[in-house]
């Protein structure tokens, strides 16, 4: 764990330091794959110790921030938070939400917001990552944006590049650069200040997203029908969750949360 995390962080740090502008390097801390007791056999002490080993190694390798991501259990998230705090790293936190707009353990977006804001200022931002495509993740961002109280904290969007498909012995994500560019603009319109791509995202997708964010003002209210047409269908479960959080009723418009922020070069 120590050797791999130090090496990975050092590679990222070296690449970032070659850029002309300041680049923040985040070290990813993902789930253990086990369930915390009493539902599972992993103790909180064991989980915290494992996360602490990783967080210390990431810091040694040169990361600026710990990114706790893809987690679905509040208990495991809290263990990772404790470990990252002990390592002296500021924290970003993102969860993965399913087709019903909840985590695997049944937690809603507002519960992630409550957890993250409780640990502020150590946690500097929170949001959603991975999931089942850009459209569904935007649904989660809608709910998170509606739930937030501390506007100073970053809102994070990190969608998969489409849906994985098994083709000719390979896992291929079906998202296009155009879809990811549109997703990035919708995410910013809803208040996201940290926007990226998760599984399947390649260099050409990141470039398309960056170019779109630089060029697109997106000043008009967002139409849900427009999001679906641009990014793909949302599940019924996610639509119901959005209606619950935003009280849309018969309206399909979502007003902007934040003014546009110019991307720094």
Q: How should each PLM-predicted stretch be described?
A:
Residues 1-265:
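Domain-level signal for soluble alpha/beta catalytic cores
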